[in-house]
């Protein structure tokens, strides 16, 4: 048996550097460690500030999903201050949030994920030349329109929010805009342009409605072969190519999922509360663990720091959370190896376990029984996971599936706006309170917990989808979701382990750096290689 350790540093940049160490035995990853190698500390910055500081500070955590940070920060204050949010404001928040995610979908797919499909390791595939033609960085026939048109949806965000990224137009009690009929019609035209010129022309090769008719894995396979346009669309080609090169065979992860949900039915969330949140959601929250569905309850969330560079080794709920960094050198002596905390969820009957966040988690929650009339019920990915299991391929398909779904919703919300009604209700700024705000950013569940005392922020904790997915081992030794997903991955070429990139990117880890590989035992650089198509 041949055993080696492989260090990949940095593997990418998501709210800081990502380093990965894996043990490989006979060409298969048998253990993995993910290290968030950069300290953030936004929670520390917010302590002692005005409660509305979160509206300004948290969107700067991320340049690509700042709108998602603003969305959940606004709802955290809405629940803490018991505000009234007019239905129009909820619709605008929904539209803006959806448009930010819509821009992320093609940008992520072509610029961060699909270029790996041109890796020389796949040159023996009969479809390799076509993959190179479509997905090569900058010059690919699908890469160019996909990346260029990815910017269209956030033009809609800017119409309502004044700018994108880093807008601050969502505030407790509503939104700071008064859109006109011209604003709405421009927004409709922009989304139609994006749909016609990318989503239906390049990705689907058919209408949004036809794709959304697919409810089972068999439906998807039949859809591919239904006609030449669908067979040769980027979606049809991606399905065929992934199955040919084996991306449907690894990257499973824990198989347990968390979605906190997003988008509210306007008339059901005019007075936001923590307890009333789940019932008002359109894109549902939920837990899928050990083959069973459970209701999401924010009170069951904790953050473990046993293997994180923070004081102590206890788990705390975010309302009582602490962010007390220590010297990494001291931390390593205690067995700590990452700046990320380890979020865990107390699943009824199971206990605290790691859960995968992201598009696949959202799609699993959407497949749960019992959806109300206003809520999304979409059984496709529950069916796929049950029949072929989670994988790099299935995780990626879940992300792309949401392009059609969110576009349809955003278009409907634009029609629902009543331009003669209010978009804001001035709140009473309470000096004491606790609030919880959450959303589904493009890469998964994103949440804020705020504690207000004497009119100032006493505690502010942000739990990102990256933390859910990339967090290290916990006090029980349970691996984080990406660590689990890396285990079992085949490594064709130790000098160019593109498979590691596939797995990490299927969680949308935004990896954009050239990578060096080192033998973990000798320290010798094996090679300098590119796993995302750019140097």
What are these regions (language model features)?
Residues 1-443, 454, 464-535:
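Active-site bordering "gate/hinge" segments
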């Amino acid at each position: 048996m041949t055993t080696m350790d492989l260090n990949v540093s940095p593997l990418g940049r998501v709210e800081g550097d990502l380093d990965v160490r894996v043990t490989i035995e006979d060409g298969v990853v048998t253990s993995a460690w993910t290290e968030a190698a950069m300290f953030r500390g936004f929670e520390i910055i917010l302590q002692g500030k005005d409660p509305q500081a979160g509206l300004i500070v948290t969107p700067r955590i991320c340049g690509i999903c700042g709108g998602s940070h603003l969305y959940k920060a606004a709802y955290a204050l809405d629940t803490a201050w018991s505000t009234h949010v007019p239905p129009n404001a909820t619709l605008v928040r929904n539209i803006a949030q959806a448009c930010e995610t819509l821009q992320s979908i093609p940008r992520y797919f072509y610029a961060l994920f699909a270029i790996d499909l041109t890796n020389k390791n796949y040159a023996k595939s009969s479809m390799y030349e076509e993959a190179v033609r479509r997905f090569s960085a900058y010059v690919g026939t699908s890469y160019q329109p996909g990346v260029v048109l990815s910017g269209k949806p956030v033009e809609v965000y800017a119409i309502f929010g004044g700018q994108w990224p880093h807008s601050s137009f969502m505030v407790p009690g509503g939104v700071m805009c008064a859109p006109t009929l011209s604003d709405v019609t421009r927004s409709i035209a922009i989304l139609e342009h994006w749909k016609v010129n990318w989503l239906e022309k390049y990705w689907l090769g058919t209408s949004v409605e036809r794709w959304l008719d697919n409810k089972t894995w068999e439906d998807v396979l039949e859809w591919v072969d239904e006609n030449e346009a669908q067979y040769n669309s980027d979606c049809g080609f991606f399905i065929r190519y992934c199955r040919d090169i084996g991306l449907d065979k690894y990257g499973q992860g824990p198989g347990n999922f968390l979605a906190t949900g997003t988008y509210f039915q306007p008339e059901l969330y005019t007075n936001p509360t923590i307890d009333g949140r789940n019932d008002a959601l359109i894109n549902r929250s939920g837990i899928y663990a050990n083959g069973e569905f459970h209701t999401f309850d924010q009170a069951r969330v904790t953050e473990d720091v046993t293997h994180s560079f923070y004081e102590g080794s206890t788990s705390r709920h975010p309302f009582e959370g602490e962010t007390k960094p220590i010297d990494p050198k001291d931390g390593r002596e205690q067995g700590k190896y990452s700046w990320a905390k380890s979020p865990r969820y107390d699943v009824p009957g199971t206990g605290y376990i790691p859960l995968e966040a992201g598009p696949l988690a959202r799609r699993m929650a959407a497949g749960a029984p019992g959806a109300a009339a206003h809520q999304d019920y979409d059984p496709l990915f529950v069916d796929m996971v049950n029949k072929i299991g989670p994988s790099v391929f299935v995780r990626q398909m879940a992300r792309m599936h949401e392009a059609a779904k969110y576009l349809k919703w955003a278009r409907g919300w634009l029609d629902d706006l009543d331009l003669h009604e209010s978009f804001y209700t001035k709140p009473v700024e309470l000096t004491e309170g606790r609030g919880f705000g959450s959303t589904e950013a493009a890469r998964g569940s994103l949440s804020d917990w705020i504690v207000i005392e004497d009119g100032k922020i006493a505690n502010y904790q942000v739990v990102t989808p990256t933390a859910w997915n990339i967090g290290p081992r916990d006090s029980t030794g349970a691996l984080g979701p990406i660590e689990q997903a890396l285990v079992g991955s085949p490594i064709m070429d130790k000098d160019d382990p593109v498979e590691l990139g596939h797995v990490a990117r299927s969680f949308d880890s935004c990896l954009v750096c050239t990578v060096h590989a080192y033998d973990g035992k000798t320290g010798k650089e094996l090679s300098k290689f590119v796993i995302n198509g750019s140097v």
